[in-house]
Design a protein with these regions (language model features):
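A cross-taxon signal for low-complexity, glycine/charged-rich
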Residues: 1-7, 11, 22-29, 41
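N-terminal amphipathic/hydrophobic interface segments
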Residues: 42-483
Length: 483
């Protein structure tokens, strides 16, 4: 009837020469005015509320209905039941009180008390909210649900969980149809083995992809490792993660050492790895990549390189150059320095067991008693063996040149320069005790009186002491900044 009367009014206006519409814009504006009530009613249907009893009231000039007992509110396919409802007729809203249950298709929302806004197709509660859509369960102190958008916004002590993942945050927006959640503030997501902490996080439930930003920390409870950074992408189906803004890897190793009274004392040893990009592959090889500007530090062991690959399953670390023209990786172990095109480190119970150096290798060791004296060896390949973290033997292959300072006890006793196709050097307490030359050996001895004060004259061509060794101070400084 309303629509019919609007059509007559429009015809009268158009046919009357006094009120004839002069242009198309005026005609469109007039149509919008005449039909606005009809369009509004179609987009926002009135809510209906029924129950066991009803009391009509005027509150501050506004018409209300209080409905008691077995209350049912409906709007389209949204159905709400509760103990009591106060309907604000002109506003198309209702206050819902007691055992509130909201349903639409597979979605169920429960709360002790809330509101429903008919014109917005929105429900809200700040009395504790529980949402279940048969895919996830979402709880919080307060929350809104927008039915036209299939979107939930929950605040304060938010918790979302499904069969594999639990997520907590201060705020969370859940897009039901997209199976997507955006969380803000003190965000934690846990899948039983890995935990991600961040200031903000976006999680796609179907694809199991997660993006995290600001104060990010990825913890693997299985191997007791953590990666800090400012941006993380985690692809759980692929078993792949990347942190590409200020990443720092930390792994704490607990070991026990025997003291003089034969009691075992616990000792914590932390592995630090810093780089521009870090990638982790959670497959059978358990690979970890540190890419570009890599720094490694663990007890007396340190390294600088372009690329580090850590095979956790095989207890093996490989460092390498990024290109043929790039700088060689550097490795320090106590008072020794090592360079080569690539360095492979074999671990045993988190301790270095063996080092393999390939391609234009150089090793130097500073003497403990005379810091001006360095034992030096250059070759094409090196294999170094360790016992209890100390060097015991080094095998050099391919055009080997060496300089070793000699000692009688702690008394300096000149040096020996030698070359051969292969060389074996034996160590004790990280000091050279014996040098063995194989295949076309040649050597020269220089007495102490020629050597004293002239140590810098006895250097191999590629000798250089590199001063950019990573330190605990810089690693802990970065860690404190990221925390």
């Amino acid at each position: 009837m309303k629509l019919f009367s609007n059509e007559i009014a429009l015809q009268n206006v158009i046919s009357n020469p006094i009120y004839r519409v002069r242009n198309l814009n005026q005609l469109l504006a007039l149509i919008l005015i005449l039909f606005s009530h009809t369009l509004f009613a179609q987009q926002n249907p009135l809510i209906t509320v029924i129950g066991d009893s009803l009391v009509g009231k005027m509150v501050s000039g506004e018409s209300t209905r209080e409905v008691y007992g077995n209350v049912v509110l409906t709007q389209g396919d949204v159905v709400i039941t509760c103990d009591k409802a106060i309907q604000f007729i002109s506003r198309n809203d209702a206050e819902l009180i007691g055992n509130v249950i909201v349903k639409k298709d597979t979605l169920t929302i429960k709360t002790p008390r809330g509101f429903y806004y008919g014109n917005l197709a929105k429900t809200r509660s700040n009395a504790g909210v529980y949402l279940d859509d048969k895919k996830v369960i979402l709880t919080a102190d307060s929350g809104d649900y927008f039915f036209n958008e299939d979107r939930a916004f929950f605040e304060s002590k938010v918790k979302l969980y499904d069969t594999t993942t639990t997520l907590t945050a201060n705020e969370l927006t859940y897009f039901q149809q997209q199976n997507r959640a955006v969380a803000i503030g003190d965000v934690v997501i846990f899948d039983g083995e890995n935990q991600i902490i961040a200031d903000t996080l976006e999680h796609f439930r179907n694809s199991k992809i997660t993006f995290a930003n600001s104060n990010v920390r990825l913890t693997n409870l299985k191997n007791n490792s953590e990666i800090y950074g400012e941006h993380l992408e985690d692809y759980r189906e692929r078993g792949y993660s990347i942190i590409d803004v200020t990443p720092l890897f930390i792994q704490v190793d607990t070991s026990y050492i025997e003291s003089e009274d034969s009691l075992k004392e616990m000792q914590l040893d932390t592995l630090f790895i810093k780089s521009r990009i870090m990638e982790a592959y959670r497959d059978s090889s358990q690979r970890f990549y540190a890419i570009d500007s890599v720094s490694i530090l663990k007890s007396e062991f340190a390294s600088k390189n372009d690329l580090t690959i850590f095979y956790r399953q095989d207890n093996k670390i490989i460092t390498a150059k990024a290109s043929e023209t790039a700088k060689q990786p550097i490795l320090w172990q106590e008072n020794s320095q090592l360079t080569g095109d690539s360095i492979t480190i074999y671990l045993d119970d988190n301790n270095i067991k063996q080092l393999d150096v390939d391609g234009t290798s150089f090793m130097l060791s500073q003497n403990e008693y005379n810091l001006e004296r360095y034992d030096q060896t250059s070759s094409s390949q090196i294999k170094i063996f360790f016992t209890d973290g100390k060097i015991t033997r080094a095998d050099f292959y391919g055009n080997v040149y060496s300089i070793y300072f000699m000692y009688d006890g702690e008394t300096a006793n000149g040096l020996t320069k030698s070359n051969s196709a292969e060389t074996t050097v034996l160590f004790e307490d990280n000091e050279v005790t014996e040098v063995k030359l194989y295949k076309n050996p040649a050597s020269e001895y220089y007495p102490e009186q020629q050597v004293t004060g002239n140590e810098k004259s006895y250097l191999l061509p590629r000798f250089v002491v590199l001063q950019n060794k990573p330190t605990k101070e810089e690693m802990y400084k970065l860690l404190n900044e990221l925390r």
